[in-house]
A protein has these predicted regions:
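General small-molecule cofactor/ligand-binding pocket signal
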Residues: 36-38, 82-86, 137, 180-182, ...
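Small/aliphatic-rich secondary-structure junction motif
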Residues: 1-54, 150-201, 220-224, 278, ...
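A short acidic, glycine-rich active-site loop
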Residues: 54-68, 199-211
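Short beta->alpha linker loops
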Residues: 65, 85-89, 143, 185, ...
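Structural beta-alpha unit
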Residues: 1-2, 23, 53-57, 72-106, ...
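Active-site phosphate/pyrophosphate- and oxyanion-stabilizing loops and adjacent acidic/basic residues
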Residues: 25, 71, 126, 169, ...
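Gly/Ser-rich helix-loop-strand patches that form or flank binding pockets
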Residues: 3, 26, 30, 95-144, ...
Length: 290
């Protein structure tokens, strides 16, 4: 199994986008993949050009300048790659090109020219993550790098989540990485108990033991270096996972695009959305089709 054969990397020339392009080149080199850089420019309505004739000449000069910036931005990477400039709405063009080129994964920044976009629903990245049929790898500011040494694979114990495992295992073998298979036990009943009920504490302990045993059995013959991590968090699953990222020195998170119910609208206040927004490392979300 080859992790990724074709990688689509949208760029808007922001600092985060430059980091993303570098990460995409590293991934393409590791996977021997074709890399497609995409820049989506705003479209000037034709009727405006007829009203102000000089506008058409300005757009033409701007396109030439854009090509020069794009060539510099893509770097001198010698691998198989392509540069595409399209016009339109960014998320629509990214999704269209992903389908048209049959990309296996879209690698894009957590935020673009707007530094607050990552905290708002409706940003380009979140629209792409919601709607893309292929995997989406979201890169955050900081020091994203490959090869990854520690991969975090969160699971809700469902068969749907475990369909992501073959890709996780392939990436672990590719990077010679260790995988932390993690499950967060979230018992909402514990959050509002004052004082804490000891019987609920016992239930939590028994659940941790049972979940650990189930995961150990499930991944016993995985063939990759892995560790089972089961923790109980009262703050919720999303915050619990982002805490694990720091504790486990995670370089890459790989998780399904939604949880136990694949028919539910993904990323509307869900766990995966919170992780994509707030994690300090790249997050690869994978959607499985029935």
């Amino acid at each position: 199994m080859k992790a990724f054969s074709k990688i689509l990397c949208p760029v808007d020339f922001s600092p985060c986008s430059r980091l993303t392009a570098h990460y995409a080149r590293q991934l393409a080199q590791a996977c021997a993949s074709q890399l497609i850089f995409l820049h989506v420019k705003p479209v000037v309505t034709e009727i405006y050009e007829t009203m102000v004739p000089e506008l058409a000449a300005y757009v033409s000069r701007n396109d030439q300048s854009l090509n020069e910036v794009f060539n510099d931005f893509a770097g001198d990477w010698a691998g198989k790659h392509e540069k595409i400039i399209a016009g339109g709405l960014p998320h629509e063009e990214i999704l269209r090109l992903a389908e048209q080129t049959q990309a296996d994964v879209i690698v894009m920044g957590a935020k673009g020219l707007s530094r607050v976009e990552r905290y708002l629903l409706g940003g380009t990245t979140e629209k792409v993550v919601r709607r893309a049929r292929c995997a989406v790898l979201t890169v955050h500011d900081g020091d994203p790098h490959l090869p990854a040494e520690n991969i975090l694979f969160p699971t809700d114990l469902s068969d749907y989540a475990h369909r992501t495992w073959p890709l996780v295992a392939e990436l672990a073998r590719l990077f010679k990485a260790k995988v932390h298979v993690a499950h967060i036990i979230d018992l909402p009943q514990l959050r509002h108990q004052r004082p804490r009920d000891e019987s609920m504490s016992n239930f939590g302990h028994k659940l941790k033991v049972a979940v650990r045993e189930q995961l150990q059995e499930t991944f016993a013959s995985s063939g990759v270096d892995h560790e089972i991590v089961v923790v109980e968090k009262q703050r919720g699953i999303g915050p619990g996972l982002t805490e694990l990222v720091d504790t486990l020195h995670t370089d890459l998170i790989v998780m399904p695009a939604h949880g136990k119910n694949p028919l539910a609208p993904p990323f509307i206040g869900g766990v995966t959305e919170r992780v994509v927004r707030m994690a300090h490392c790249p997050v690869l979300t994978v959607r499985h089709h029935q």
